[in-house]
Amino acid sequence: MTVTSLVDFGHFSPITEVCMWFKNLQLYRFTRPFEHSADALEKMLETVLFTPCGSQDMSKFGWVSPLGKGTQALVHEAAGQLLLCARKEEKMLPSSVVKEMLDEKVETLEAEQGRGLKKKEKEALKEEILMTLLPRAFTRHSQTFLWLNPADGYIAVDAGSAKKADDVLALLRKSIGSLPVVPVALKNPPEITMTEWLN
């Protein structure tokens, strides 16, 4: 996404409020109207619900309620604006541990067979090691909130990097089929705008 739009945060109160609430902010503008109702969006998100990692899964990514545990709604609507939450679970497998086990396995087999293992054979061994370690691996969880303002044509992602925001937008795109957005460029640097808020 290379096309950008210019926004003056100081004169756009809905976005200003979201900026103050989100710890990080990646802001995008819809290039076409977002016409999905909250109910329709809810049904689409249900097709990509978050489920925990199984014993052989490296990661899982899906939607959870933005209001936390004890609630089931995947879309929280207020005054025509929508709040979503994506949850990700990842298995933690240190590459150094995998490499050490692989090196030992390769050394043993090469000694037994009296030949060097081919690249494909090493890749197969690595896959076997991963499958052995995955059920015992620690997991890491993260949640990312999205705020949609269809009326004004904006979507904000509470992400510290464009890469993380793009991953979440890709999940939303997968859920609803299409998500035409472009990143927004600011007229004023964030530090100047925030200083103006405090004055």
Which residue stretches match the model-derived regions?
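Surface-exposed, low-hydrophobicity interaction/linker segments
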Residues: 39-145
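N-terminal alpha-helical "arm" segments
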Residues: 16-40
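Short, flexible turn/loop "capping" segments at secondary-structure junctions
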Residues: 20-21, 77, 147-150
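Short cationic amphipathic helices and targeting signals
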Residues: 26-29, 82-85, 153-159
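Short, conserved secondary-structure transition motifs
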Residues: 183-199
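N-terminal amphipathic/basic-hydrophobic helices that include classical n-h-c signal peptides
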Residues: 1-18
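Primarily extracytoplasmic ectodomains and periplasmic/lumenal surface modules that are beta-strand-rich
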Residues: 35, 91-93, 163-165
